[in-house]
Amino acid sequence: MHLGAYRTRHGKVSPTTETKLFLRFIVLCVVWISVHAQGQGIDILQQLGLGGRDVRYTSSVTAVPSSSWSTPLPQGVHLTDFGVILTDNAYIESPLVNILPISLRQPLTVLIGLQSFKVNNAFLFSIRNNNRLQFGVQLLPKKLIVHVGGKQTVTFNYSAHDERWHSFAITVDHHVISMFVECGKRHFSGETTSDVQTFDPHSVFTLGSINNSSAHFEGTVCQLEIMPSTAASAEYCRHLKQQCLRADASQAQRNLPHTAGMPTRHPAHTPLPRGFPGTDSPQKRFTEQDSLPKGFDGTELPRETFADGKSIPNNRSNGSATVHESQEHQTPRAQLTSFHSGNISAVTLPNYRIQAKEITTKEETNLTLSVAHHLPSEARMNEEGRINPLFAGFDNITQHEEAAGLPLPKKASSGFAHTNQDTMKNLEKALTANLYTNELIEMERILNSTLYRVMYGPSVDNHLELRKEGEFYPDATNPIEGSYEPQAYDYYSYEDYNAVLDMEYLRGPKGDPGPPGPPGPMGIPGPSGKRGPRGIPGPHGNPGLPGLPGPKGPKGDPGLSPGQAASGEKGDPGLLGLVGPPGLQGAKGLKGHPGLPGLRGEHGLPGLAGNIGSPGYPGRQGLAGPEGNPGSKGVRGFIGSPGEVGQLGPEGERGTPGVRGKKGPKGRQGFPGDFGDRGPAGLDGSPGLVGGTGPPGFPGVTGSVGPAGPTGPPGAPGPMGLSGSRGPSGIKGDKGEQGVAGEPGEPGYPGDKGNIGSPGPPGIRGKSGPSGQPGDPGPQGPSGPPGPEGFPGDIGIPGQNGPEGPKGHLGNRGPPGPPGLKGTQGEEGPIGPFGELGSRGKPGRKGYMGEPGPEGLKGEVGDQGDIGKTGETGPVGLPGEVGITGSIGEKGERGSPGPLGPQGEKGVMGYPGPPGAPGPMGPLGLPGLVGARGAPGSPGPKGQRGPRGPDGLAGDQGGHGAKGEKGNQGKRGLPGLPGKAGSPGERGVQGKPGFQGLPGSSGDVGPAGEPGPRGLPGIAGLPGEMGVEGPPGTEGDSGLQGEPGAKGDGGPAGSAGATGEPGPRGEPGAPGEEGLQGKDGLKGAPGGSGLPGEDGDKGEMGLPGTAGPVGRPGQMGLPGPEGIVGTPGQRGRLGKKGDKGQVGPTGEAGSRGPPGSVGENGPKGARGTRGAVGPLGLMGPEGEPGIPGYRGHQGQPGPSGLPGPKGEKGYPGEDSTVLGPPGPPGEPGPMGEQGETGEHGEEGYKGHMGVPGLRGATGQQGPPGEPGDQGGQGPKGERGSEGPQGKRGVPGPSGKPGIPGVPGFPGPKGLQGYPGVDGMSGYPGKPGLPGKQGLLGVPGSPGRTGVAGSPGPQGGKGASGPPGSPGAPGPKGEQGLPGQPGVPGQRGHRGTPGDQGLRGAPGLKGQPGEHGDQGLAGFQGFPGPRGPEGDAGIVGIVGPKGPIGQRGNTGPLGREGIIGPTGGTGPRGEKGFRGETGPQGPRGQPGPPGPPGAPGPRRQMDINAAIRALIESNSAQQMESYQNTEGTLISHSSDIFKTLTYLSSLLSSIKNPLGTRENPARICKDLLSCQYKVSDGKYWIDPNLGCSSDAFEVFCNFSAGGQTCLSPVSVTKLEFGVSKVQMNFLHLLSSEATHTITIHCLNTPRWSSTWADGPELPISFKGWNGQIFEENTLLEPQVLSDDCKIQDGSWHKAKFLFHTQNPNQLPVTEVQNLPHLGTEQKRYIESNSVCFL
């Protein structure tokens, strides 16, 4: 750009232009530094513009990653705290030169940190040139493959698909590829055959896949970095990013994908808006070392240091134009985008005012954007709230909403990311029309020439402050939602723009906004510019507006009852919510998390050895280990803690029928079980019988009374109405009382004989029957083996404390005690010595920008630059993948109707259809006439038990009742709970001395007593004889404890001791004798409100009350709770035969019935036209055994045909890989014989207390038990403390409408009405019948407060009050004493069978059952397919007959036979073509040609020969004169017609091949297309349509869509006897191919690598084109069955299916990696036909 463009009208360079030139020089320096800073490592994610929150800085350049506010993220890419999330639709591709420098050479290290979400075979990244892969890392399910070009790969057994975080390093050093894991502690290496090639500069780098159509990596990538050395691989953890370390630390908690900005460090004095990253959580903050580049300290610059309070304007841009912003309360931040992305970012203009003119849109809305030293807190916005961006119209305009006072809306940010496409198109049209003048082009060159942002001033470098998109400061005006379409603009010329810049020092008062100017004229379209560089992807759009609320959902199922429902399982993570509006400015953040732990302190002095601790308690018994092999009988062990209840196992096979046991005695009625949790809904049961007419539905809500209409004439009786829709099922009522036995019904009419019903579905498994009666005692069996060792018993109660032991030895010195408390502050010490001279301080900050210097002289005009060279042609794109198989063709035209079939047999009656849905609610009928009063009805049956009424009011105080008669002595009550410790009793009288006790047993040696006082001197004994002086003896041990002395006299009574603590609870004592009847005690004080008592017996029918006032009709009540299932009523009388119902809908398909009897062969019918493809019919008649067909495409199911007679056996079908649904559960086998009783095992230890089991299933409702005997009156309990107010429960779902309530009691008396006019005295009426009880009246208004009454007498015990709110759960009580067994209740009624439950989840695999008895002989199986031809084995039994050989080649042509006799007259030929009119003969018209004779023997004649014969005959006819005889003309006409007939048949045979050797087809599908009546069989084909001599015979499977199946030369050989040319043509004419290979093996497991022993590889298969089918690859064959792993000395087989969309890969020509056979190992390979379609 020449400098002349910067001159102003005054001939000088403006300060702004001079600043821009200076900043460009700085930008070039930054670019040069960044290129040399790449040697430390290339961050691939940063280069792709996907830098996350964690950024490490290199050199002196502050790298700020492109986040959601500066660079648009590609589709399928999300940013999170831990890195970049790639989804399945993410596709990121970039030229390699934009990612890696061209000078990158080996060795190099790839540092990777990732977490995978989905298991697949995707590439993490790939580098490819055209269709050649140069380098890539592929993640397989259990492997990691490094591709290094030249089809060289190195595989590592490393699994990264486990949803965990992995970090590893891969080094490439010439031909050695290594992988380092666990921070370099482990590594694996592999070598390639040649050195790894260097990268081509024209290559393409792809992240997450190898191309767009292959599998995509789905997961999070926190680091992908390439280092140009291998030194960092051994300690690669030192180079991991912080976000990788944080992700590894938070392995347990996974964050959902979300888009976030960068974490930012903020100064303490800067208020941050709510929601700003860094204020949410302490994890989002950076330390100064992380957020500042090298060379800067962490000190902050106070606001006062800015001269005159000026803040540095901050300009940001990511494209060709810049929106200038000013920050008044924040520190500006710098930005450095990717050096290779081609972006253009504007530079910072400090301390200059830029005043932009108003931009006018078609809505006549104005906005003035300015950058100044001081900006108002709010920008002015017009009344419509729409904002037009500054410099709108340039490419890639980026606006940021961070500047204080510039309310830039989200709609205007990120380069119009949120305007629709029409708006952008209109904007481009307007710009194209308006940017033609030289001034605007010059301005665009100025704005487009700035390359990178440079930090100007120290405050720019010290602080980074990034904001997420959509956040605003509280003093800014929030954006108005809406769109804008700028149409016409009023642009300044370049000189005017600089004039505005020069006038910034002239500060006048701010004027009022002027009126909008008129739209400018349309500019001349400018010349089309050169194609610019490809821009980086735009930012993500803001979330859309929330949608309207959806329709109300269906009513949910009723909740569980009773009790509060259990907490549901945690739901799946919800979708990412919309970005909320910016919140208000938050307060100062909380104190940050504590810093990293300090360095490890020095080791303290070792403490003294401590005393030996007391032995610990025995640990808990561990869980039971897996069941091992039965070992020898071990020592009696302790019982393990009971394990958790396992899941229900799968239902076992039906057991062998046992001997039916004798009927056992009737068991006792069990106790009613607890109410279990409500089980899941059961499966739909089998259709029940048609029920009777249901009860009428509930009455609807009474509508408002309409005006009374005129009384119409009585209408004629209407016709019989249709039966109403069935009402909803009524709520189950309470259990009714036992009804009176009904009278026997009248004998019904004999019903019609019904059709034979189809076998019903298998019934629900019945409940286990009652245990049978004990059988007769059997003979004494042999003694069984000793039983298993019993479980150890529970740990016993701790015994009593033993006697005090002897005094122990002196213990070791204890450890040092804890440090003492902090002492008081000591006196101030003396002044210490002077310290050393400090190091030199850091250089001071860079000074502020000086005053602008004088304008420089005008520069010289620069030379015109040369035109750039045309770029090289880009690399050729990769070849596309094979297209998807075409959809199935349209359905063919309908064929002509076939002949009428014979009358079918009468079908089986279908299942009764389900009851129809209730019809719509009919319109409200007209009010009927008031009927006459009916006669009083008879008393109705006993009503159902009503709901519990409200608690009655407290009754009046009752008088003292008379003393009752002495009651019978009650039964002994249960032992009471232990009472509290009583107060110390009075000192008792000293008792008499007791009897002498029995001598106690010798106790243990007690502790040595203290020496007693010196005893009295004893009486001197007789002198003994003088003994010999013996040697001094050793010191003897202490003697044994002496026997206890006689009991001494009783001492004086001691003083009363202190009250002891309550002892442990004693065991329940023996029941005492019944005491005497005590006297009646005094009447106690009235007790507290008791719990509500049980409902009493229903009272007798009361007298009818007086009729109350008519109450208002109540609203429909809520439905009551579901009642208890009542006892099934008695069977009613047989109803009359109803009318014939309507034909119900088609019932569900029943289970397959037994095969019918073989019918007689009917006459052969005429051949019908080809109909539409129907469903798979029943088994057809037995045909010749053909080649197994493959599974065809899924067709639309046709209507089910009538069941035909049992056909003969058809072709054996191919083994299907899809398992059928599991069969119904088998019937329970009969009870087996009772086993012999084993020997009594040794008594085991008492087991531990068992873990409380899971709550059992809900038992049947037991009958109410008989009332128990009345217990004795318990002691008065203390009044409990009032429990805390319970938490308010979650409001339950609204219940169903309840049964109409019982008519209420008469309401209170209403207010006295005004006195009415005296009426005429009426005649005395007859006494009326007592009326029914009226509804609850309307409550009257409250009356006046009455005078206080006299104090009433003391009230009696009030009625039970309502139950209080549930108190807080009390502490767990001690285990209660075992209660006495209750009175056995009566046997309850048998409950109604419950609904069939849902199908249970498949249980765990059960333990293998015991070996069953030998089963009965099974039915004769179907004949299996013909076995393969065996190898030549040892001379033994003659093997089975081999397969039929192929049809031999055609033999040589035989000699010409003798002329046979004259054949009979042939059939009439087809009508020939009409010939041309011949020349008129001299003898008049010739007679008509005679009928053609019998056709001669067919000869091989082609079209050329026929035409040649025709031409020769015509030429001969022309040579003859017209005087030929009539016979000559007739003979010529005959030859012509014969030739034409042959030509017609020959053309027809070419168009419609017959599949014969003389007229072969290309492939079998041609026969299916040309002929509509073909059947499966052998046909001849010629794929290249050459000479018919190279045609070959194939099997055409038209049932599978026209497959062409080639049989191998031999079953045991992989050869097919077809030339390569024909096979290539067959491949070209086909779209898919299948091939099945079976390996018969004897003790040779060789398919899966998991079964392979040793270093041998699993077997693989070589296809026709040389590709290899093997395990864990994309060409892995489908294993239909694999029994070769069974090595039991019998033949087994492994069956493989090869199905591919690339026919060139089949047939399989070789089986590789077959192991060497041992002495007892054999195998052979069986090849089935290969079929092409």
Swiss-Prot record:
Entry's localization field: Secreted, Extracellular space, Extracellular matrix
Low complexity compositional bias, start-end: 573-599, 699-708, 923-944, 1056-1074, 1175-1205, 1323-1339, 1371-1386, 1434-1444
Principal cellular location given in the protein's record: secreted
Residue intervals of the Laminin G-like domain: 102-229
Compositional bias annotation for Basic and acidic residues: 1237-1246
Renumbered residue ranges of the record's region Disordered: 257-335, 505-1499
Ranges of compositional bias, category Pro residues: 512-524, 776-789, 912-921, 1485-1495
UniProt feature, compositional bias: Polar residues: 312-324
Coiled-coil features, chain-numbered ranges: none
Recorded family membership: Belongs to the fibrillar collagen family.
Purpose: Involved in osteoblast differentiation.
Protein name per Swiss-Prot or TrEMBL: Collagen alpha-1(XXIV) chain
Species name: Mus musculus (Mouse)
Lineage: Eukaryota, Metazoa, Chordata, Craniata, Vertebrata
Gene assigned in the entry: Col24a1
